[in-house]
């Protein structure tokens, strides 16, 4: 049994399709998990409760931790350490391997490309929390108590989801005939992971015996685009003029007074100030895939949004 903790998210939905195509038995787990085509079973569970986590993971051989929490540092601080601790304990009891799908918040502001060897140096509260839970998992596999892995992604975009900053700020507005937006600086390159690539890499990593007990950056196309280039390609796919506005820090600070999500996002704006370069060469060397070209990914994502807007 392969168990996915965190049903309904962009990566989880893609992952279910891939695993179902391999005729794998799949258990989907979430607080309010709904039946999903391809899943063998669906379980509602609160992973902050140890007993529920143990029950949800029981009988699993591989567990994917793909949980998404409300974007709130207080909720993250309270819930993430408990979720990680309970999931690790549940995997130990089940004898299951654990893959944690992570982000890059723990690296902090990096000069140059982010690699798997980049030290943790968080400059945000959310980054501190992610560093803490990632370190917890790494220490478990280093001690030999658990077989684990971290698969880390850049900011992402892709079809079949309304999640991801480019989807919200670029694809959705264009699909509605509106002007797009970009965060802070549209002139610096910003790596973006294509969600189908991320899901495919999770399957490949789990199936590669030598990939365990390591951190991997999932395949993300090199030579990232600047915001203005990304918007221009997206506009072309929608057949519209590349009209957009840049959301600068002062505007976002004011907006945060009225919108809790914007307020929570403010501490992460350092990622948009300067080049945001995500290096996945380790994966490319091992698996021979460097990521879907941006033009193709943007075309597919735009097609998905156009289909939904009809």
For the regions a protein language model found, what residue spans apply to each?
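NAD(P)H-binding glycine-rich loop region in Rossmannoid oxidoreductase-like domains
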Residues: 34-94
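Mid/C-terminal beta-alpha module of Rossmann-like enzyme folds, strongest
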Residues: 2, 201-265, 280, 292-310
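Short-chain dehydrogenase/reductase
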Residues: 77-81, 112, 123-135, 164-168, ...
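Alpha-helical membrane-targeting segments
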Residues: 169-191, 243-276
């Amino acid at each position: 049994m392969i168990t996915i903790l965190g049903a309904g998210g962009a990566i989880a939905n893609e992952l279910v399709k891939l695993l179902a195509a391999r005729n794998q038995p799949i258990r989907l787990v979430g607080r309010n998990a709904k039946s999903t085509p391809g899943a063998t079973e669906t379980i509602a569970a609160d992973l902050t409760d140890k007993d529920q986590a143990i029950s949800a993971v029981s009988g699993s051989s591989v567990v994917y931790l793909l949980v998404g929490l409300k974007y709130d540092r207080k909720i993250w601080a309270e819930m993430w350490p408990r979720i990680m601790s309970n999931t690790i304990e549940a995997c130990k009891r089940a004898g299951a391997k654990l893959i944690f799908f992570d982000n890059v918040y723990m690296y902090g502001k990096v000069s140059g490309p982010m690699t798997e060897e980049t030290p943790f140096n968080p400059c945000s509260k959310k980054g501190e929390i992610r560093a803490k839970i990632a370190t917890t998992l790494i220490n478990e596999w280093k001690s030999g108590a658990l077989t684990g892995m971290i698969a880390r992604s850049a900011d992402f975009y892709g079809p079949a989801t309304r999640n991801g900053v480019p989807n919200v700020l670029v694809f959705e507005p264009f699909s509605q005939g509106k002007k797009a937006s970009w965060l802070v600086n549209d002139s610096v390159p910003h790596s973006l992971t294509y969600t189908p690539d991320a899901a495919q890499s999770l399957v490949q990593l789990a199936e590669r015996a030598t990939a365990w007990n390591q951190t991997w950056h999932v395949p993300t196309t090199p030579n990232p685009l600047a915001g203005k280039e990304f918007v221009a390609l997206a506009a072309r796919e929608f057949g519209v003029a590349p009209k957009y506005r840049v959301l600068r820090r002062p505007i976002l600070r004011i907006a945060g007074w009225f919108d809790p999500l914007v307020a929570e996002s403010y501490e992460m704006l350092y990622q948009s100030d300067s080049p945001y370069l995500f290096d996945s060469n380790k994966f490319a060397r091992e698996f021979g895939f460097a990521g879907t070209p941006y033009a193709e990914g943007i075309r597919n994502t735009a097609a998905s949004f156009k289909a939904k807007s009809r």
